[in-house]
């Protein structure tokens, strides 16, 4: 590809295709059967975030495909694609034909798991993914419909638009990678460090509150600074209860306003 920015890589058992955004538009280089060919490409990939293939664990492709086959339940006509997933985040995705569920991998080759938020492991991975690189956040919420949602200040800008702060909302659902959406918010909110939040405590609160309940009544958790305490609090809401907890999970409902 030379110095042209790479926007997509497709790999199957029989061929490798690499798409670059060159001076004359998108160009795809394809290796198949020892022969390299090129073709112009009509695609929305022209707007995709370019990436450096060397930053991806291409040496782990055999183990990636093995893991994907195990999780998807099929290795039929596997295809691995590296391309922007959302908001500048480039992921590896393995699909099959006939189609099963796609399996996503990070650049280092680690799998993006389907999560069980009632376990410490599931909550920890979801929280880490949703927080990303944000050193401070406005709020962290969990609910069964969306998974973990983190609102954090836009790190690359200290300015406001129309008097509203720029906020990045990052959502990590149980089955999909993080999806980021910029938004404006004029509501006041004190920031806190997400490292103060223990995923084991959150998982225990979800597990304890959801036992013997219908799935629709799995609790919603909200971690923020809304109770004017020195550290964030965890608010737990179900259809028939509202409690507030400290970061160790202790019920402090009667101690806060």
PLM regions: where:
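Extracellularly exposed regions in secreted/surface proteins, prominently low-complexity, repeat-rich
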Residues: 92-134, 174-175, 183-187, 200, ...
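Short, surface-exposed beta-strand/loop "edge" segments at domain boundaries and coil↔beta transitions
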Residues: 23-29, 99-103, 155-162, 240-245
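Extended, hydrophobic interaction surfaces within ordered domains
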Residues: 63-109
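Extracytoplasmic low-complexity, Pro/Thr/Ser/Ala/Gly-rich segments
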Residues: 1-41, 115-156
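Compositionally biased P/S/T/G-rich terminal and signal peptide-adjacent segments
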Residues: 19-45, 161-182
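DNA polymerase processivity clamps
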Residues: 5-17, 71-88, 141-143, 211-228
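A cross-kingdom feature marking solvent-exposed beta-strand/loop segments within repeated
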Residues: 2-5, 45-52, 75-89, 111-126, ...
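Long, charged/polar, surface-exposed segments that mediate recognition or autoinhibition
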Residues: 40-76, 177-215
């Amino acid at each position: 590809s030379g110095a042209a920015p790479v926007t997509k890589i497709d790999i199957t058992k029989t061929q490798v295709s690499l798409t670059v955004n060159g001076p004359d538009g998108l160009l795809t280089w394809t290796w198949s059967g020892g022969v390299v060919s090129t073709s112009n490409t009509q695609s929305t990939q022209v707007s995709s975030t370019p990436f450096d293939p060397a930053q991806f664990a291409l040496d782990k492709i055999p183990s990636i495909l093995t893991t994907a086959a195990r999780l998807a339940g099929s290795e039929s006509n596997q295809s691995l694609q590296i391309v922007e997933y959302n908001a500048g985040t480039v992921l590896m995705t393995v699909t099959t034909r006939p189609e099963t569920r796609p399996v996503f991998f990070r650049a280092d080759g680690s799998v993006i798991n389907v999560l069980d938020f009632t376990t410490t492991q599931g909550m920890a991975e979801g929280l880490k993914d949703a927080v990303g690189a944000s050193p401070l956040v406005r709020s962290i919420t969990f609910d069964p419909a969306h998974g973990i949602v983190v609102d954090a200040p836009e790190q690359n800008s200290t300015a406001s638009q129309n008097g509203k702060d720029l906020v990045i909302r990052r959502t990590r659902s149980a089955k999909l990678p993080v999806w980021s959406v910029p938004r404006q918010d004029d509501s006041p909110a004190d920031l806190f460090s997400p490292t103060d939040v223990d995923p084991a405590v959150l998982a225990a609160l979800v597990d304890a509150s959801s036992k013997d309940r219908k799935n629709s009544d799995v609790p919603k958790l909200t971690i923020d600074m809304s109770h004017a305490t020195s550290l964030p609090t965890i608010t737990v809401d179900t259809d028939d209860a509202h409690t507030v907890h400290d970061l160790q999970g202790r019920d402090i409902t009667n101690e806060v306003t």
